[in-house]
Design a protein with these regions (language model features):
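Alpha-helix N-cap/helix-start positions at coil->helix boundaries
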Residues: 79-80, 95, 110-112, 142-144, ...
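N-terminal accessory interaction module
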Residues: 1-73
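Residue-level signature of alpha-solenoid helical repeat scaffolds
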Residues: 87, 119, 151, 183, ...
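Alpha-helical adaptor scaffolds
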Residues: 148, 179-187, 193, 197-202, ...
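Alpha-solenoid HEAT/ARM repeat scaffold
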Residues: 83, 115-116, 147-148, 179-180, ...
């Protein structure tokens, strides 16, 4: 049975990437218009059964160009729901929608609008926009945009996401950008994560980045995080503060092996 989408709830959303990918040529676009003013925009999967206390007027199928033109006006004039409008733009087929997203990501009038465009490119148009996201990760002058592009790529299905995050973690000139790259790499669970993050712990010139890289290890899936933290603790060449950080995050783990290690440490057996 299809799940229900309540248009009266402000929390109802377009869902996740899978919903976009499952759409077969059509999406449901809803707008709440009161006294001639658009108050809300929602784009929903065709599989979502819509409910509302208000009367819903069905306009039928709308041509792509007409729909895009209406949405573009709302991106430009109503920042309150520009992200919702950009999400709706993202699910439109064709080059015009993608070009608009790229333009907003590259040179939107506000940082928040740029970030929204970047996110929806990653969620709904990743096959076509992976290269653009990488360009923003490595060439944009704003560290906030580079961080957000990395986050967005990490939340996508892009095949190259782990390679791009590793490169950013090694090469970006901003310590905060490098630190966040390691965190998002760990969240992807990519097989190359441990080796790459261990490199950062051992080699990054910034103390805070090294500490954040240790934290990133704790975010690796299941026992992989515990193993990575054990490796730091067992490396006598690591600075004391880094090993202490590894011990701290190990203590936050629910792993039985971590508890056993801590018991032996407290008993003086290590």
């Amino acid at each position: 049975m299809a799940r229900a989408c309540d248009l009266d709830s402000r929390n109802v959303n377009y869902g996740v990437t899978d919903e976009f990918q499952s759409a077969k040529g059509e999406m449901q676009l809803y707008a709440l218009i009161e006294s001639g003013q658009t108050e809300r925009i929602r784009v929903l999967s065709p599989q979502c059964r819509v409910t509302s206390r208000r009367d819903v007027i069905d306009l039928g199928l709308v041509e792509v160009d007409e729909s895009l033109a209406w949405l573009k006006d709302h991106v430009a004039t109503r920042e309150a729901f520009s992200s919702d409008a950009l999400a709706a733009v993202a699910v439109h087929k064709g080059s015009a929608a993608l070009s608009f997203l790229i333009d907003m990501a590259d040179a939107g009038p506000t940082t928040e609008l740029r970030k929204s465009a970047i996110f929806w490119m990653s969620q709904a148009r990743i096959t076509e926009s992976a290269g653009e996201l990488e360009r923003l990760m490595f060439r944009d002058g704003s560290s906030e945009i580079r961080r957000h592009a990395a986050f967005s790529l990490s939340q996508s299905t892009a095949a190259n996401r782990s390679d791009a995050l590793i490169r950013q973690g090694r090469e970006d000139g901003d310590p905060e950008v490098r630190a966040q790259a390691w965190f998002w790499l760990a969240q992807t669970g990519a097989s190359a994560s441990e080796e790459a993050i261990q490199w950062a712990v051992a080699n990054d010139p910034d103390d805070d980045v090294r500490k954040e890289a240790v934290f990133a290890m704790s975010q690796l899936p299941e026992e992989r995080g515990v193993e990575a933290l054990f490796a730091v603790l067992g490396n006598q060449r690591m600075p004391r503060d880094v090993r202490e950080q590894a011990l701290f995050w190990l203590a936050q783990s629910d792993s039985d092996r971590a508890f056993q290690y801590l018991d032996r440490l407290l008993a003086g057996a290590l």
